[in-house]
Amino acid sequence: LTAKLGYPITDELDIYTRLGGMVWRADSKYNIPGGASFKDHDTGVSPVFAGGLEWAVTRDIATRLEYQWTNNIGDANTVGTRPDNGLLSVGVSYRFGQQEAAAPVVAPAPAPAPEVQTKHFTLKSDVLFNFNKATLKPEGQQALDQMYTQLSNLDPKDGSVVVLGFTDRIGSDAYNQGLSEKRAQSVVDYLISKGIPSDKISARGMGESNPVTGNTCDNVKPRAALIDCLAPDRRVEIEVKGI
């Protein structure tokens, strides 16, 4: 009975050693001149040492070259000798029950990150408010009712709505900033009253920044004509961000 310890040199070639013991029985018979004969036997355990190489020809079949040494077999006092035994052997082994290695499980590719979409809507302030005012007109409320229907149809998941108020350049910067904030807040308050959650919508006043008329009204001098020319700058923009 031996224990085998192996170490892989390559994927196919192992070096190994076996250590253990062998139970033996030795029988002896000898004759004495004159016709008498005697028989005797002995049993015991001797240490076994072995070492070798094993090469995997296939998944199931392997060959090996081994040298085994057994020390002190028998008892010299009982059977008259106590030899050692050395054995050089070449063998072939077949391994039952070997199975193909399972194919590696490939994790599915992660789902692409959801695309964040932003929708932009622009409403004319002259439709929503009277000039220089921040209170919604009836026709302005009707325009926002239509806008609310569009926002509801979008139904953004985890989305948000930002209302941006803009004025024209008539008046001081501070006045126009305040007016734009009030107009944006008026639109927010109305949309909240229609059903948009208050934590999903916010107001931001942009003052007279980002005019869309550019320099087209620079040569317009009469005030009434200038107010009409700068009408596109007076607007409310609504940004809807969602997935």
From Swiss-Prot:
Domain OmpA-like: 116-243
Transmembrane segments: 1-8, 13-21, 47-56, 61-68, 87-95
MF-aspect GO terms: porin activity
GO cellular component, one term: cell outer membrane
Region span, 4 X 2 AA tandem repeats of A-P: 107-114
Disulfide bridges in this chain: 217-229
Keyword Transport: yes
Sequence repeat extents: 107-108, 109-110, 111-112, 113-114
Record membrane topology: Multi-pass membrane protein
Record family assignment: Belongs to the outer membrane OOP (TC 1.B.6) superfamily. OmpA family.
Domain comment (free text): The extracellular loops are most variable in sequence, and in some bacteria confer sensitivity to phage and/or colicins.
Function: With TolR probably plays a role in maintaining the position of the peptidoglycan cell wall in the periplasm. Acts as a porin with low permeability that allows slow penetration of small solutes; an internal gate slows down solute passage.
Protein name: Outer membrane protein A
Source organism (scientific name): Atlantibacter hermannii
Organism phylogeny: Bacteria, Pseudomonadati, Pseudomonadota, Gammaproteobacteria, Enterobacterales
